[in-house]
């Protein structure tokens, strides 16, 4: 999963009259909380490493990501990064496509937008735009999805990653269960979150 270093920066999206806050970097880059209430900081910049399959991640998480993949593969699990860093434009395209799909099913524009936002993060609120979150899929020629997701759930914290959107925390995160979405927070924090069975929002509250 070797790669090359690239650079990128984030441009604040036009948010109209939406009430929002810019996510705080007070607790460090690895603990930036991005969700529907907290948008990516306007001046956020990221140095990217390109993986062998063309996906990109923040260079700071690359060593632990590689370590995690090496460990999984050594135990016979086949997995790969399906999604890494996304630009603002790419996130907007995903949203537009999801809205269009619902409209094609006969939903009104407002209905389609509301439904789409249950599945796709509003541009400016996606952790993929930080570069420190990855969607991990199974190489089904080697492992089942369930086996890979189970391994990740039980072991990702050892490498600094957390399952960002657990099924029992939807009311807090505002996002449905995503067993493939892992976010880097650092090994110490990831172990705390894992052992306590909490989500990132709850952990950040303990720091306030």
Q: What residues fall within each predicted segment?
A:
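Extracytoplasmic cell-surface/polysaccharide-interacting catalytic and binding patches
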Residues: 1-208
């Amino acid at each position: 999963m070797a790669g090359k270093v690239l650079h990128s920066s984030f441009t604040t999206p036009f948010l109209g009259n939406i009430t929002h806050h810019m996510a705080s970097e007070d607790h460090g880059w690895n603990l930036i909380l991005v969700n529907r209430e907290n948008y990516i900081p306007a001046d956020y910049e990221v140095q990217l490493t390109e993986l062998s399959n063309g996906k990109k991640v923040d260079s700071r998480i690359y060593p632990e990501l590689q370590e995690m993949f090496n460990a999984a593969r050594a135990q016979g699990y086949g997995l790969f990064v399906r999604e890494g860093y996304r630009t603002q434009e790419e996130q907007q395209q995903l949203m537009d496509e999801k809205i269009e799909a619902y409209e094609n099913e006969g939903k009104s524009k407002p209905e389609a937008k509301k439904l789409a936002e249950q599945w796709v993060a509003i541009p400016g609120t996606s952790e993929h735009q930080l570069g420190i979150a990855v969607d991990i899929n199974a190489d089904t020629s080697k492992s089942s999805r369930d086996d890979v997701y189970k391994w990740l759930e039980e072991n990702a914290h050892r490498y600094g990653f957390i399952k960002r959107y657990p099924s029992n925390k939807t009311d807090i995160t505002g996002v449905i269960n995503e067993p493939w979405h892992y976010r880097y927070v650092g090994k110490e924090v990831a172990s705390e979150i894992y052992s306590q069975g909490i989500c990132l929002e709850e952990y950040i509250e303990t720091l306030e």
